[in-house]
Amino acid sequence: MAAFPKSTRALMIGLTGVMVMVIAAWAASSASAACKNRGNLDVRYCDENGDLVADTPKDSSKWLNPSTLIFSYTPVEDPSVYENVFAEFMTYLAKKTGKRVKWYGAESYAAQVEAMRSGRLHIAGISTGPTVFGVNLAGYVPFSIMGKGGKIFGYKLQLITHKSTNIRKVSDLKGRKIAHVTPTSNSGNQAPKAYFKEMGVVPGKDYKIIFSGKHDNSIMGVANKDYDA
């Protein structure tokens, strides 16, 4: 759980969310009229089996087989910190695949998606929000989620305000200036848009949305009174 400045107040809202592990094991196949089903995938991919993710190209010459696998974790405040956190995992991955494994510290969700789309990133742990964009635009194939002892790890959406405000419930957000994180963020944009609407508040209509870029930017912005919540 994030640590908040003493000047802020947090409201907890239940949210089903998990970290997703994805893999890109092949290069993008060329757009082809022969593709019977593509769904919402980019034209470079095909989904003939209807499982909502890109199919492995029928032409094996398009499969990727890099001598070095590039691994990345979802963008956080300091990407370099997580390189050490995942050192043991990368060693395990190298042992199991027989390949070298290198760390890529993505600075943003978009950078992570683009890196996999261009073939520069092969395996990644990504946030829930960008997953759909990664699947549709970059050929992400989700295959696992974080868990332990048969239990899945999740998290909660947290609505925080400055303690000097009179915001006590979601309806108090009306007419305010509210920080969201990025358009692709789940807890920082997509989830509140869905949950708040159910609570009678429509983000972007009932209050002004300002994208802060990062979760910690939102927290510090509230602490400094740049945003109402």
Describe the residue ranges of each PLM region:
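Bilobed "Venus flytrap"/periplasmic-binding protein-like clamshell domains
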Residues: 71-94, 129, 152-228
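Short helices/loops that flank or line small-molecule/ion binding pockets
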Residues: 110-124, 137, 171, 215-229
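Extracytoplasmic
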Residues: 66-68, 88, 98, 111, ...
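Structural recognition of the beta-strand scaffold that forms the well-ordered cores
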Residues: 102-105, 123-125, 142-144, 160, ...
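N-terminal hydrophobic or amphipathic helices and topogenic motifs
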Residues: 2-14, 25-111
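Ligand-binding "clamshell"
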Residues: 134-146, 203
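Glycine/small-residue-rich loop that forms an oxyanion/phosphate-binding "nest" at active or ligand-binding sites
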Residues: 143-150, 157
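Hydrophobic core
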Residues: 19-24
